[in-house]
């Protein structure tokens, strides 16, 4: 079985072969894996990790993030409004911003916590009711609200 470092290096090598104009950050999805499994990658110098559950992220990452300020934690799953306050405390990026209520909670909490997270708006381009994401016809208004009215740092 390949080590986590070997797998990381292979992925990184394949990305470099593509000769991208802009740098690419690999987000190692660490959900469900214990910290002991991920630690070699942290020790190797990788610093972007993705989790899809707030409580799992808190229990796994709270201690190690205090000692390693270079670690960046990405919330890659659906974020429920009732978990938003806790999410701001542990995550650096939210990849699933999809409604105004959530945006408002995240903004207020990041002000209270003196943090500045980076956000990706999740868009439901197929307008499928069973899927998350802001409908595409509401995207411009939502983006303007987030960036101009409450000043969230939308990066994607």
Question: Predicted regions span which residues?
Answer:
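Conserved alpha/beta-domain cores
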Residues: 1-156
């Amino acid at each position: 079985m390949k080590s986590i470092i070997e797998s990381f290096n292979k992925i990184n090598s394949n990305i470099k072969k593509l000769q991208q104009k802009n740098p690419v950050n690999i987000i190692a999805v660490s959900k469900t894996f214990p910290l002991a499994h991920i630690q070699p990658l942290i020790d190797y110098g990788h610093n972007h990790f993705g989790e899809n559950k707030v409580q799992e992220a808190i229990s796994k990452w709270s201690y190690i993030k205090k000692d390693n300020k270079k670690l960046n934690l990405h919330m890659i799953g659906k974020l429920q409004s009732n978990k938003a306050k806790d999410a701001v405390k542990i995550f650096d990026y939210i990849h699933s911003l999809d409604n105004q209520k959530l945006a408002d909670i995240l903004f207020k909490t990041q002000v209270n916590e003196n943090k500045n997270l980076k956000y990706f708006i999740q868009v439901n381009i197929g307008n499928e009711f069973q899927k998350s994401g802001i409908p595409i016809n509401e995207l411009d208004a939502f983006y303007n609200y987030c960036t101009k009215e409450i000043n969230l740092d939308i990066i994607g």
